[in-house]
Amino acid sequence: MLGKALKVATFGLCAVLPLAAHANNFNYNMMEFRMGTSPGTFGGEVTTYFTENTHFIGRADSEFSGDWDIAGGIGFNGPAGQFADIYGQMLVHNIKKDSGDLVGDEWKTEVNIGTRVWFMQNIELHGRIGQLIDNDDSKTSYNLGARFHSTQQLSLGADLKDNGTYGQQLVLSARFAY
């Protein structure tokens, strides 16, 4: 009797919670241009698919006063339901402060994880948390924001972020999908 009830419960659970595979809900082939406030920074980011669920990342930010934060690495992405994606990234940063060196002063690694969710039609909410790892001084990085997708190729966003280098900023961005 218990075996029959277990089989019925398992069948019912499988019928209610289908384990169908979904494609990614967001495009990870994109180019972004951004401007941050307090301190004023300009930056950009490019991501492109390596496989269906992995992508390469390259990003750079600067105050244009002899400084930069350049990062590159690889990330994963995949669906977390019908309207959301989960993603993560492993990056290597080269950070240059105001010194005269040709190459940046510091090399750091970053590991992060985040999610992107369709809140309404053409409105995306996203969040990411990570760690900028240094032997002496590791820092938490985060990004919370919203993005309006005006077309399939163009979206405009506003984020509250701290990338671990420039501190807390309000960032406005334009993203172009390809």
Predicted regions and their residues:
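Residue-level signature of outer-membrane beta-barrel architecture
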Residues: 48, 76-78, 115-117, 148, ...
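Outer-membrane beta-barrel "beta-signal"
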Residues: 72-74, 142-155, 167-178
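Repeated loop/turn-to-beta-strand initiation elements of outer-membrane beta-barrel proteins
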Residues: 26, 52-58, 79-88, 119-127, ...
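Short glycine/proline- and aromatic-enriched beta-strand/turn motifs that initiate or cap beta-hairpins
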Residues: 21-64, 69, 177
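Transmembrane beta-barrel strands of outer-membrane/channel proteins
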Residues: 31-37, 58-62, 88-94, 127-131, ...
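Cleavable N-terminal export/targeting peptides
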Residues: 1-27
